[in-house]
Amino acid sequence: MDKIIIQGARENNLKNIFLEIPKNQFVVFTGLSGSGKSTLAFDTLYAEGQRRYLESLSSYARQFLDKVGKPNVDKIEGLTPAIAIDQKTTSKNPRSTVGTITEIYDYLRLLFARVGEQFCPTCLEPISSMSTSDIISQICHLEENSKIIILAPIIKDKKGSFNDKLESLRLKGYVRAFVDGVMVRLDEEIHLHKTKKHTIEAVVDRVVVNNENASRIASAIEKALKESYGELEVEILQDNAPSIRKHYSEHKACFKCKMSFEELEPLSFSFNSPKGACESCLGLGTKFSLDISKILDPNTPLNQGAIKVIFGYNRSYYAQMFEGFCEYNGIDSALCFNELNKEQQDALLYGNGTEISFHFKNSPLKRPWKGIIQIAYDMFKEQKDLSDYMSEKTCSSCEGHRLKASSLSVQVAGLKMADFLTKPIEEVYHFFNDPTHFSYLNEQEKKIAEPILKEILERVFFLYDVGLGYLTLGRDARTISGGESQRIRIASQIGSGLTGVLYVLDEPSIGLHEKDTLKLINTLRNLQKKGNTLIVVEHDKETIKHADFVVDIGPKAGRHGGEVVFSGSVKELLQNNHSTALYLNGTKKIERPKFELPKEKHFLEIKNVNINNIKNLSVQIPLKQLVCITGVSGSGKSSLILQTLLPTAQTLLNHAKKTQSLNGVEIVGLEHLDKVIYLDQAPIGKTPRSNPATYTGVMDEIRILFAEQKEAKILGYSASRFSFNVKGGRCEKCQGDGDIKIEMHFLPDVLVQCDSCKGAKYNPQTLEIKVKGKSIADVLNMSVEEAYEFFAKFPKIAVKLKTLMDVGLGYITLGQNATTLSGGEAQRIKLAKELSKKDTGKTLYILDEPTTGLHFEDVNHLLQVLHSLVALGNSMLVIEHNLDIIKNADYIIDMGPDGGDKGGKVIASGTPLEVAQNCEKTQSYTGKFLALELK
């Protein structure tokens, strides 16, 4: 069958859809937000494909997998195994990196283990093997009369009880052994837990190093090397100090530094294994340590609470000691830390060994001044109590590279593992694409490296091909966006080489500049050409125009959507007269509302920005305007706005002056603002109790209205009676959740509808109180649009609902679980909440890609809302790739010219027309696409 045939799809708002989709083609689902695109693509097609696959497994295998319910559809024919690539599955694991997600790091580990050249991390000399005579010579030349124990490593960090090994050692004549670091006699009973890791070392000899014992030592060494296949340990005993362990090997050693090294294996380069992980940070690359900026305010007088850890409740002892320190060292405590000289600053922080005299509770005391940092540690013995004063910092031992020094010193083609992980993927691709880099390998090494290099090159190319050349393989997976994560997984799928699969993708163009969109489309085409069917939920013009087949769901959102308003080729679509086609063929255009910008111009100037790829940048941002920050992916937009301006401005606005600086970044013009609000795409709540009604505050007004009803007053019900978060009106069986969680132990928890309230969340008595014939549960089940009509005569409620309508969210229900909302919907709910507040006209709003998940019609709505906030005198700063927003902005700041090391600069700024006209001169990609759009 060359088609997927859907009959009677009724999931969520779908209205008994019948649809035929051609197989092995590039299919785009489009339509307004909330029209039912994702329901059809993910909740129907993907869910049924996944369910059928799971049904084919044995009942034993199924019990370990999440159960997928059958979607509400009569029949789907021609369905193939389905893979969903959405944006919600970004990793939260601090050990995940771009390299580990794509498995490129696994191949790099293999390459380094098989053909890597080892160098000593101390002297940087090449490492070579030690012979038996070298080992004997080194040990015999230890300090005269040193007491040593010569050990043969038998078992190293392995699970098991090892009774046979211990018995074998005893029969060979060994009397003692070290078991997990403790010396035991082998003729005694030894019980080892078989599920725990153990280390066993046979004691070959205990001897004093001197000339008389030279032959005895040599004999013991030969015996140990034979017993443990070329390895031995020597424990040097010391009278008044812990013993020292030295490892010797016939395999790898640095003779200059007298150090031996283990044979390389892939685990030697794994930061998730003790064999390769940095011992200081345990492979995380970062450590939590005291942050001086958090325990000390350098601009506050010392006697007015500058040192936060010693001032406050129950800390008078340290405050008195500090006064004594200042008096002894001649420091004026009315000064700020910044006003002290270097010697005084160091003494205050780290101590100077002097004894301080001071009074505490009328008693004279004398104590050494250890410095503020040591005092902080002494005050808070448990590190968790210090969490407020700590920051995550790069590990000083491995410099953030996560591996041991011995692993980081290994080289392939003159580069270390850290070099491959910190270079942009584009550079890594070009490096592996040049075979001359590996011409130094001998024939045997070339044969070993060839298949590994092929796998690395393929995978790196796919990442580069989907527009992610600016990322690094060592980039923490937690810091990549949803769009980047999705494109990484697309690249991985191409590398997998699967055919005959139905791929369902959710807006893969998110976060992608127009320059890279065609690259992405080409990559998707490659996936389709392998014999796969692609269903892409998308709003991007270019992606829609390059599709083989388009399905438009509508005509509106929510209850007014759920129908197929068009299905066919792009050519047929452009001749249609419904909403999507009208925007594509130019009949309808997104235009800004007309209002005059303020004549008096103010700017926010950010100076001395040094972060990621931005070096010593200063930039002016006009206020009381809609300003778009543009640029290709990785050019530095988020670094400038989200990582620099946002936290700095939020901190400084608490005590704003005309010019202020924080961490070297200076901001001029803050006096024109009273607050900075970042409207991100994080969920509005993490539990089923959070919903749009509670978040926007409209729920409070609705509860008050229900409490004012005559029946409610007679029964003495207050507004709290209509809350599902407190006892009184809620259903106590489910505690107002509407569902009951059943723990399934080794299976995922299951949510079942409460059989007492049937999902209504309230008890029957509360549900008897009605407004215009509707209970509180009925109201929560209404869409925003329905509720707006229902509460039209109640201004306090209607005005809040109107803001949700204004941002294009009329289709969501008031009581919709916050965890089911998309990032774009969550962001617009936050925007609606801001719209409903009393405005000061001095707010700076920062938004990151607010058009995510928005149809052209929704973008039009959003643009009106953004400009309405600017019309009130506020400033709007938007990071955006969508040309419909960019061309209607008041001002553009374009970063680039490219991503990664080739970015970090402001290459163009001005009105959209100015940026477009100067695009050839500035080499602005945004300007070039803008020029085409403004024609």
UniProtKB/Swiss-Prot annotation:
State the PANTHER family in the record. UVRABC SYSTEM PROTEIN A
Protein name in the entry: UvrABC system protein A
**Which parts pass through the membrane?**
none
Q: Tell me any Pfam family this protein matches.
A: UvrA_DNA-bind
Which of this chain's residues are annotated to bind ATP? Answer: 31-38, 631-638
Q: What InterPro entries has UniProt attached to this entry? A: ABC_transporter-like_ATP-bd, ABC_transporter-like_CS, ATP_grasp_subdomain_1, P-loop_NTPase, UvrA, UvrA_DNA-bd, UvrA_inter
UniProt main location, coarse? cytoplasm
Keywords for the protein's UniProt record, in alphabetical order? ATP-binding, Cytoplasm, DNA damage, DNA excision, DNA repair, DNA-binding, Excision nuclease, Metal-binding, Nucleotide-binding, Repeat, SOS response, Zinc, Zinc-finger
The record's subcellular locations are: Cytoplasm
> Could you name the domain of life of the organism this protein comes from?
Bacteria
Subunit note: Forms a heterotetramer with UvrB during the search for lesions.
Instruction: Give the boundaries of each C4-type zinc finger.
Output: 254-281, 731-757
Q: Which GO terms describe its molecular function?
A: ATP binding; ATP hydrolysis activity; DNA binding; excinuclease ABC activity; zinc ion binding
* Protein purpose: The UvrABC repair system catalyzes the recognition and processing of DNA lesions. UvrA is an ATPase and a DNA-binding protein. A damage recognition complex composed of 2 UvrA and 2 UvrB subunits scans DNA for abnormalities. When the presence of a lesion has been verified by UvrB, the UvrA molecules dissociate.
Of which family is this protein a member?
A: Belongs to the ABC transporter superfamily. UvrA family.
GO terms in the biological process aspect are:
nucleotide-excision repair; SOS response
Q: What Gene3D superfamilies does the record tag this protein with?
A: ABC transporter ATPase domain-like, ABC transporter ATPase like domain, ATP-grasp fold, A domain, P-loop containing nucleotide triphosphate hydrolases
Coiled-coil positions = none
